[in-house]
Structures are given as C-alpha cells and as structure tokens.
Amino acid sequence: MIDITMDIILDKPEQMLFALLRSALNSTKPVSEILFTDISPALWQACYKLACTQGVMALAWDGIQTLPACLQPPKALKLNWAMAVENYEKRYLRYCHTIAELSAFYKTHGITTVQLKGVGLSTYYPIPSHREGGDIDIFTYSADHSRKSDAEANRLADRLMEEKGIEVDFEHSEKHSMFYYKGIPIENHKTFINSETYRIAVKMDKLLQKLLQPVSAELDGKCSILIPSSTFNTVFLAFHAAQHYARGLALHHLCDWACLLNRYGLHIPEEVTDIRFRNMILAMTRLCNCLLYTSDAAD
C-alpha cells in the first residue's frame, strides 16, 4: 500500500476549479452547488486565471455548464471564457486536420506516423476539443522494414519537410527534431525519452517501443490518425509527469491521467519493476481518486 497524506489544503479558487474539473470528467457526479453559492466576481476571476495557467480552461468550462445559471460566473467573465473556449476549439480542429494531412503524406512515402500526447490523448476526453495542448508530437518509423529501417524512415520524414522548404531544427532535443508545418510546431520523435538525461531511459525506451502497438482513432469524426496503446500511455504519461514533477505538475497532466483511468483503468505492465516509478504511478492514481474522483485502486 502506498502511503500518501491527502490532507491537502486548497484555497477557494482551487476548490472551485477542482469541483468544475470533477464534474467535467465525471458526468454522473454533479458539481457541488453549495461551494458556488455567494461567490464574488474576484473569486471567479481567480478561478479562471488558475484554469488558464494550469491548461484546463476549456475543461473547466464544461464543469460550469453543469451549474445552475444563477451560480455561474458573472456575465462579462462568462462571455470571455466562452470566447476563449471557442477559439481553442477552432485551434484544435486545425491541429486535427494538420496531423491527419501530415500522416497521410508520410504514408505515401512508406512512413508510419503515431500521434503522441496532445491531440492523440484528446480522444480519451469527454469532449476531445477541450483537451488543451501546445505542439504536435509524432513518432515516425518504417511502414515496411524490407524497404527501409525505422531510423531511415525517421530521417526521411525530416528530409521531406526540408524538400518542401521547411527548416528542420535537429539541435532542439536529443530525442526529436522540430519544424513548423502550416504554422504548427511539430516534434518528430526518434525515441521517447532522453537517454542522456535519465539513467533508466534506454531500458524504458525499449519497453515503450514494445508497448506502442498503435491503434486507429478518429479526430473530429473524420480525421483518421494512429495513437499509442493505452498500456503505452500508462507508462509514457507517468514518465512524462515524473520529468515535470520537479518544476511542478500541471493540472492538465493530472487530468490526462484521470481520463486514462476512467477509460481503461489502471494496468501497470509487468515489465515495470522499478519501485520508485511504480510508486509514481500509484501516487498519481491516488491523487486522481482523491481530487478528481476517479475510482481506480492505487494499492
């Protein structure tokens, strides 16, 4: 049993935000109306600012929709919030069409493209277009190993962009190159984890290669892409969160984990034997259970 003290003290805007997120992620668990009685405009503004900072602005908006009209934010803030959500929805659709187009282009050159994190994870959310993200992360490899290796396919993906006159940054990171496609930042991964930074990275990267097992997903009801298996995401999301932990874990990381739990439950691959990493997975699950009302065991 992992021991986590859950006596977490939240200020009022934090309480409000978690309540909205719980309602957004769990349609069967209505938001607490008592918490939102007699809320001042200043507190609502603080809640909105916190939601924006934590990358869950659009998701929190879904929680607001479950509140009676008399308990919702003041009209001016509500209008600004709604406009921000609408703008993000438009951006999300642009991302969906861009990644689908890029994947189809690479396919004609014998390259398989898997969408990591971001847009791919949005398929786990109740309203996919309300999962906020920044750049697009892809993993490219060979669709036919009799013709080219995975490394050759990954390099070809970059070279094809250069042939289009697109500048590719090869110094951005050890694990991926970076370029802008139709104004959207794309990170083209050759590995999943920086082997120079983390001692267990080489072993973990091999495990992630094994667990990748991509499946087809639809974005916006018409854009077909490939996303990793849920087992891959269990390991990858937890490791990604661990990387961010020292700088502070954002709520959108926790919401990603909650959506994974809500859809697939917690299934830690038997190959994950490092006790500290397993404890990280269990700790994130316990946090989601306590703060976002997921119900998966974290024992």
Task: Label the predicted regions.
Residues 2-134, 140-295:
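Conserved NTP-donor binding/palm subdomain of two-metal-ion nucleotidyltransferases/polymerases, i.e.
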